[in-house]
Design a protein with these regions (language model features):
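Outer membrane beta-barrel
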Residues: 1-114, 129-145, 180-183, 222-245, ...
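Transmembrane beta-strands of outer-membrane beta-barrel proteins
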Residues: 8-10, 43-47, 105-109, 151-155, ...
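Sequence/structural signature of outer-membrane beta-barrel proteins
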Residues: 12-16, 34, 49-53, 111-120, ...
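Transmembrane beta-barrel outer-membrane domains
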Residues: 18-22, 83-87, 126-132, 167-173, ...
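Outer-membrane beta-barrel translocator domains and adjoining extracellular loop/strand segments
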Residues: 20-26, 56-61, 116-124, 160-168, ...
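Membrane-embedded beta-strands of outer-membrane beta-barrel proteins
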Residues: 25-27, 92, 134-137, 150, ...
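Detector for outer-membrane/organellar transmembrane beta-barrel domains
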Residues: 145-281, 286
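Outer-membrane beta-barrel "beta-signal"
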Residues: 273-279, 319-333
Length: 333
C-alpha cells in the first residue's frame, strides 16, 4: 500500500458448505530505526486471529499443517489460542524486533459483533468480555547457514459463551515454543518446530448453566514437526500432536456422533505426514520467484480421538475412522 503500510487478507471458499468466508487478515504499519546503537524494526498490526501476525512457524497461525481437509472431523477440544478465536475477533498489537534477535509483542482482542460474524461466515464461540490481552516474547539467533529460536506466548480471555450478560468462562493460555532451521547452501534444508500450550479454565458461566460438570479444568496441546526439502522442490514433513485435559461429562460426553466422547475426555493424539512437490522452487527456475505452486499429498492419522481408541463416541466410531488422505494444489500470486 505504502512504504510503511501493508496488508494480508485471505478469503476462503470450499465446496463442502458452498460458502466464502473471511479468513486471516493482517494490516500493519512497520518502520526501522535504531535504539542504543542497535537496529530495531517496530510497528502495529491490526488482525483477526491471535498468532496470525507472528513472524515464526511455531504458533497456530502458520504452523504445520498449513492446510487440511474441510471434510475431516476434528477433536472436540483445543486451547483458545490455538485457533479457536480465529476470524471471530479483531485485535491490535504493537511489536518490535531488536538487534535482529529479540522479538516482543503485546496487544489486545475484542470479539466482532454477532451480526458481522454471520455476514463473513465466521464462527460463533461466544463473546469476549472486555479486552483480552495477548503477549509474545522470542529470542532469535541467525548463524547464516542455520538459525534457532525459543520463546513464550500467552493470552487471557473472559468469554460469555451464550452472548448474554452475567458470569464468564475464564481462560489463561500460556505456551512455549522453539525452532531450528538448517539452510546450508540451499540444497538440503531441514526444519524442526515445536510448541506446548497449557490452558487453565474457570468455567463460571458453563458450570452455572449445566454445560460443564467441573468449575475448574485444564487443557494442554503439544505439537512437533520436522521437515526436509531438497532444492526447495521435493519435500516431506512429519508432524505429531497431542491434546490432553481433565474429564468433564457435560462438556465432552455430548452424545453426538463423531464429535462426542463416551469417556468424557478431550484426549486426542495423532500424526500428519505430507509429501510435496514445488515445481518452480529452484533458484534457476524460469518462474522464480514469481511462479509459486505446490502439489502435495497429506495423511492424518489418529491413535486416540476424544478420549478413546475404539468406540470413542459410544456409537461405534473408532479413532482410526477419522484418518484422512488429502491431496492439494496450492498456488500463490
Amino acid at each position: 500500500m505504502t512504504d510503511h503500510i501493508g496488508t494480508f487478507i485471505q478469503v476462503t471458499g470450499n465446496d463442502f458448505d458452498r460458502k466464502f468466508a473471511m479468513d486471516n487478515m493482517d494490516i500493519r504499519f512497520a518502520d526501522n530505526g535504531a535504539l542504543a546503537g542497535k537496529s530495531i524494526t517496530y510497528g502495529i498490526s491490526l488482525n483477526n486471529n491471535p498468532t496470525v501476525q507472528d513472524p515464526f512457524n511455531t504458533l497456530n497461525g502458520w504452523k504445520f499443517p498449513y492446510m487440511a481437509s474441510e471434510l475431516a472431523p476434528s477433536p472436540a477440544a483445543s486451547p483458545l489460542i490455538n485457533g479457536v478465536l480465529g476470524q471471530q475477533v479483531l485485535g491490535a498489537t504493537a511489536y518490535a524486533f531488536y538487534d535482529k534477535s529479540l522479538y516482543a509483542e503485546v496487544g489486545g482482542y475484542k470479539t466482532l459483533s454477532r451480526s458481522l460474524r454471520n455476514k463473513i461466515n465466521a464462527g460463533e464461540d461466544g463473546s469476549i468480555s472486555g479486552v483480552s490481552p495477548y503477549w509474545r516474547l522470542s529470542y532469535f539467533k541467525d548463524m547464516g547457514a542455520q538459525n534457532l529460536r525459543a520463546g513464550f506466548f500467552g493470552m487471557e480471555v473472559k468469554l460469555q459463551p451464550d452472548f448474554l450478560s452475567g458470569p464468564t468462562d475464564q481462560y489463561r493460555d500460556i505456551g512455549v515454543d522453539a525452532a531450528y532451521q538448517f539452510l546450508g547452501s540451499g540444497e538440503n534444508i531441514f526444519t524442526v518446530n515445536t510448541s506446548y500450550i497449557n490452558e487453565r479454565r474457570t468455567l463460571n458461566s458453563s458450570f452455572a448453566g449445566g454445560s460443564a460438570s467441573n468449575l475448574h479444568g485444564n487443557l494442554t496441546r503439544f505439537d512437533l514437526a520436522g521437515s526436509y526439502h531438497y532444492l526447495n522442490t521435493y519435500g516431506v514433513t512429519l508432524g505429531l500432536f497431542d491434546t490432553r485435559g481433565n474429564k468433564d461429562d457435560a462438556l465432552y460426553n455430548t452424545g453426538d456422533a463423531d464429535a462426542g466422547s463416551i469417556n468424557s475426555s478431550p484426549n486426542s493424539r495423532g500424526y500428519t505426514v505430507q509429501a510435496d512437490w514445488t515445481p518452480w522452487g529452484k533458484k534457476s527456475s524460469w518462474g522464480a520467484p514469481y511462479a509459486n505452486a505446490r502439489l502435495g499429498l497429506q495423511y492424518t492419522g489418529y491413535t486416540k480421538f476424544n478420549g478413546g481408541k475404539n468406540n470413542y463416541d459410544g456409537l461405534g466410531r473408532d479413532a482410526k475412522d477419522n484418518n484422512t488422505l488429502f491431496a492439494f494444489i496450492w498456488a500463490a500470486f
